Amino acid sequence: MSEGESKSTHFGYKTVEADKKADLVAGVFHSVAAKYDIMNDVMSFGIHRFWKRYTIEVSGARPGMKVLDLAGGTGDLTAKFSHLVGDKGEVVLADINDSMLKVGRTKLRDRGIVSNVSYVQANAEALPFPDNHFDIITIAFGLRNVTDKDAALRSMNRVLKPGGKLLVLEFSKPQHEVMRKVYDLYSFKVLPKMGQLITKDADSYEYLAESIRMHPDQDTLKQMMVDAGFEQVDYTNMTDGIVALHRGYKF
């Protein structure tokens, strides 16, 4: 690349300058933040709750642990972790988008979840936390929106304690042809219409469908985690691989 030539990346199916993607993604989530929880229930038929519940179970969170819920949005995982780690533990809900953070903070405070939760606006590619700080890091439905996923994974590895665990819950690739066809039809024909009806924003849900297709598949993401320094990396497919939970450790 010649001097002065900017790097490019994808925003859905569009090719954009890498330094512009974060602002474009921010626009999506500023637009949908207020109706984010409702839309999650509608577009997944409530199944996202099962995916998140399984993630919590796999985390092994215990009293006294420090947990980073990265790209934590409206706080579904944070609420569960807050209960599990107790008063001697700590949960940090971090998100790059201030609109999502505001919704999450309001929701959790309205539910009385205040004593062990803090909120940080942070970029996953350069986390503002000390080395070896967290016992558990989760990033649920956030990694595909990150511009430099390799940098983000390395940053997560840095702030994770030795013996700590990273859990990446993300949309992935269906394993069977029939499911792929049904999923494509739903994603590109139905989902944007739902977005328009509920959030008055079809474009953001077109981006969602496209961003899922551009995200690395299960085995590629597994190798990316290994390359970032994680060990014993594996994954579990859910709903035929529409979603996968990747797990890796720092030793």
Curated annotation (Swiss-Prot):
Pathway: Quinol/quinone metabolism; menaquinone biosynthesis; menaquinol from 1,4-dihydroxy-2-naphthoate: step 2/2; Cofactor biosynthesis; ubiquinone biosynthesis
Enzyme class name: transferase
Gene3D superfamilies assigned: Vaccinia Virus protein VP39
MF GO annotations: 2-methoxy-6-polyprenyl-1,4-benzoquinol methyltransferase activity; demethylmenaquinone methyltransferase activity
Enzyme Commission number: 2.1.1.163, 2.1.1.201
Keyword Methyltransferase applies: yes
Protein residues bound to S-adenosyl-L-methionine: 74, 95, 123-124
Keywords noted in UniProt: Menaquinone biosynthesis, Methyltransferase, S-adenosyl-L-methionine, Transferase, Ubiquinone biosynthesis
Catalytic activity entry: a 2-demethylmenaquinol + S-adenosyl-L-methionine = a menaquinol + S-adenosyl-L-homocysteine + H(+); a 2-methoxy-6-(all-trans-polyprenyl)benzene-1,4-diol + S-adenosyl-L-methionine = a 5-methoxy-2-methyl-3-(all-trans-polyprenyl)benzene-1,4-diol + S-adenosyl-L-homocysteine + H(+)
CDD domains, per the entry: AdoMet_MTases
GO BP of this protein: aerobic respiration; menaquinone biosynthetic process; methylation; ubiquinone biosynthetic process
TM regions (residue ranges): none
Function: Methyltransferase required for the conversion of demethylmenaquinol (DMKH2) to menaquinol (MKH2) and the conversion of 2-polyprenyl-6-methoxy-1,4-benzoquinol (DDMQH2) to 2-polyprenyl-3-methyl-6-methoxy-1,4-benzoquinol (DMQH2).
Family statement: Belongs to the class I-like SAM-binding methyltransferase superfamily. MenG/UbiE family.
Protein name in UniProt: Ubiquinone/menaquinone biosynthesis C-methyltransferase UbiE
Lineage, highest ranks first: Bacteria, Pseudomonadati, Pseudomonadota, Gammaproteobacteria, Alteromonadales
